[in-house]
Amino acid sequence: GDEANVHQAEKCLGQLKELSLRGNEITAQDVNYVLALSMEDQESAIVQLDSDLICNTINGRPVKPKTIGQKKYVDQIRGNMITFGIGPAGTGKTYLAMAMAITAFRSDEVSRIILTRPAIEAGENLGFLPGDLQSKVDPYLRPLYDALYQIMGAESFQKNMEKGLIEVAPLAYMRGRTLDNAYIILDEAQNTTPAQMKMFLTRIGFGSKVIVTGDVTQKDLPMGTKSGLDVALQVLKKVEGISFCELTSKDVVRHPLVQKIVQAYEVYEKHRSEERRVGKECRSRWSP
């Protein structure tokens, strides 16, 4: 074959061999990602990612950043008081945030973990759902529970929750509180209003760290309602101590088909945005 291609293949195989020697089981996803990195002469980054162990799950599986974007996200969390992780489904933004929070909690960097998300999504209103408040909010918080169970184990999670050291609650429960010495994660932040986002960010006390995650393409807010995440991106971009990390379809670590779906929607949204821009220019040009 072509000499350049052969050399590229050798480098990729060398990195995969290094991963294997480190005790990793090489997956098709690893192969595809090393190939993608090699196109940008960054194939050696895969070994650097493998060196960044955040924690282990209850089953002993290591939790590490799997892409360059995820590595950047984890580094920004470590270096800032408030980090916004923005990206599509499957990029690991919430799971990695959970892993970072649990690691900080285990090492006594913080005394508790607080996880929250807006309770109203997909057009549903809690007042019209059957059951008591806990049963109403649980479905909205289930993804957070799932990640905690996987990393901590159900028994450890329940014990810490009973002691008040881990709290999983709707965003409305944050009002009027000051959250000191805590690791706080706001998930699905695209479904907050600007007032809710401001309320949340002003709850932060001394010794706390905050991660805000969201996907600006998946808003469930009523038509015409601004997203608190969009406003925060505009207002807080230059505030020291706050970082914004944008994950993309390149950082999707679920089934390869999910990555293709995300990419297809990115193209669609780009076309829609361009159509709106052109339409706005035309209306402006022809208006009296």
What are these regions (language model features)?
Residues 12, 55, 245, 279-282:
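Generic recognition of cysteine residues
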Residues 38-68:
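Conserved loop-to-helix interface motifs that mediate assembly, gating, or partner/ligand docking
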Residues 58-72, 76-186, 190-273:
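Conserved helicase motor core of SF1/SF2 NTP-dependent helicases
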Residues 275, 279-288:
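Positively charged, low-complexity/disordered segments
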